């Protein structure tokens, strides 16, 4: 069976409903490294937060090429793309924090009960956002899904 190319916008619509995926990055020795993450789809990208000491952060900073994989009920998609890592959230207000807040809202589909607490936790944990910009998608969307 050949994997069918899928429009990036259609793939992102599917990924937005799933919210759990696997980011595959390239280690310094060329081997793949994978991590499961909860993501949000925002403005044509896939976004998730990370702690700054994770392997995926170092791998992406060295080589931004990634694959992001999602699957659900017999459907699966692999997005090829590039990823960028935001600056560490060091202030409770600003662009880095705005990205983390928008990602939380999209994943949780609700407001946080205490935004001050959320902001302080993001700064304390030195959170960063990873943004994946898909360039192509292949896979299979089960007709039952749509």
How should each PLM-predicted stretch be described?
Residues 1-5, 75-146:
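Charged, gly/pro-rich active-site loop segments
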Residues 11, 19, 44, 75, ...:
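A generic secondary-structure signal marking the coil-to-beta-strand transition
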Residues 1-3, 53-73, 106-110:
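Short, solvent-exposed cationic patches
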Residues 18-52, 58-60, 66-70, 78-82:
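Short beta-strand segments
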Residues 1-17:
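Extreme N-terminal tail/first-helix region
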Residues 11-12, 57, 119:
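Short amphipathic alpha-helical segments and helix-helix/interface helices
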Residues 15-16, 61-62, 123:
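Alpha-helix boundary recognition
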């Amino acid at each position: 069976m050949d994997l069918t190319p899928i429009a990036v916008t259609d793939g992102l619509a599917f990924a937005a409903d799933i919210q759990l995926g696997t980011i595959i990055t390239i280690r310094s020795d060329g081997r793949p490294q994978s991590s499961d993450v909860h993501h949000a789809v925002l403005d044509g990208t896939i976004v998730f937060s990370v702690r700054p000491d994770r392997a995926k952060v170092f791998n992406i900073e060295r080589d931004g090429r990634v694959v992001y994989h999602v699957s659900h009920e017999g459907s699966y998609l692999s997005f090829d793309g590039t990823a960028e890592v935001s600056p560490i959230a060091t202030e409770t207000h600003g662009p880095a924090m705005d990205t983390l807040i928008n990602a939380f809202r999209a994943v949780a589909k609700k407001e946080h009960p205490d935004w001050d607490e959320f902001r302080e936790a993001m700064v304390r944990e030195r959170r960063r956002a990873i943004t994946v910009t898909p360039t192509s998608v292949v896979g299979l969307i089960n007709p039952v899904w749509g």
